[in-house]
């Protein structure tokens, strides 16, 4: 596989977040949160309580949020079953491990009853992990090196193993046949649980900080540990090359991370061979590509807040249409949980099968009894476009059912092409007919529009003619009225004035005459 396809994987924080996550901060080497395609589980600040929400429905967690409660002890580790997304295992500091069954659709009320209780450890239990191949096989690691393998259905111990010191990380090999545990004694112990023996005890660390590890395949694993020069490195080991216990044999290659003392966990994508170095208390994620057989430094991701707990999604939960190659859920100081998505930057996004080898589909290859009897198997994997799972991208190409492969002869291919050509010609004829109809409609509308415009123009012309006629007729009617009026007034004045003055002149002499006679 070409390393250039993955070395440029770019991490980006998704905008959506879970808020008001009052997650506990009890000191532990385990995980405060667990995630799968259905649920996100968080160990709550109240002793023994676990909040479970829909992993795809981002929300602000309410104070009265339904939760798992009833067991009065601090949660030290959480993990969902790879075969039953509703089965949650929780390890506690009172030496007990409980299994809870989440109802379909999530919690609608407080869950107080577990489906299984395991109390065979004598010390705190910071690690719980499911077998990746066989159903109902659980491994738990406790203080002072007690490692138990037990039946999850019955709560019965199958075997008790003893590490050389308190474990700092515990993991099954990809085939579920071996168990690895790094310890505070600077070593890694490899166990064959069905043979009830330690098959390897290797020195991997030369400083006092806790080392962590992760399986690359069934024979190789990577560690994050320190050298004598206090350099923190990612180192690749091969168990086939180790001949003696407590030796430094088996190291294949390494690459320096930095010189800090923060405990760093390697998260390994076994399909793409990408390795993510994530330190508790740091915001950065360093990426390394080992697909070519040597470590190639990738692009670092730098977040805004330091990580308290980070977990990795299963590959079947990724969005293949966005070319997403990995995704993490991270809990930070500000009581938030957000997702970090790693994608391959491309101009044209879309499903690229070369980026996605077959992935584990969530089906158990063995039962508990088959595994105990000594049967071996690899995880069941399927091509991405054959997985029927609601967490996989909803694009049809990714969720179509598995089809039988049909070998086609040249004649069959020719017939198939001829059929496609015939279908295309029919479609072309249909489109041409539709186009002709549209053109007719367009012409008809245009003709109607021109007629309407012509009528409007005629109406406007008629209006203008009427207005002009009115303007011409109006002055002829008004002019004679203006001329006649002053004539009438003058005639009236002439007639009225003489009639009023004449009698006055005649009356005056008549009044004076008698006065003269009297005087005489």
For each feature predicted by the language model, list its residue ranges.
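WD40 beta-propeller repeat blades
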Residues: 118-309, 314-317
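Terminal intrinsically disordered, low-complexity extensions flanking WD-repeat/beta-propeller proteins
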Residues: 1-29, 264, 281-282, 290-423, ...
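Charged, low-complexity intrinsically disordered regions
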Residues: 410-413, 417, 421-520
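A general secondary-structure boundary signal
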Residues: 48-49, 168, 204-209, 213-217, ...
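Residue-level marker of intrinsically disordered, low-complexity segments enriched
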Residues: 11, 49, 147, 188, ...
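N-terminal non-cleavable signal-anchor helices
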Residues: 240-243, 253, 400, 406, ...
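Generic alpha-helical hydrophobic packing signal
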Residues: 87-92, 99, 121, 137-139, ...
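WD40 beta-propeller repeat fold
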Residues: 1-153, 159-163, 204, 225-228, ...
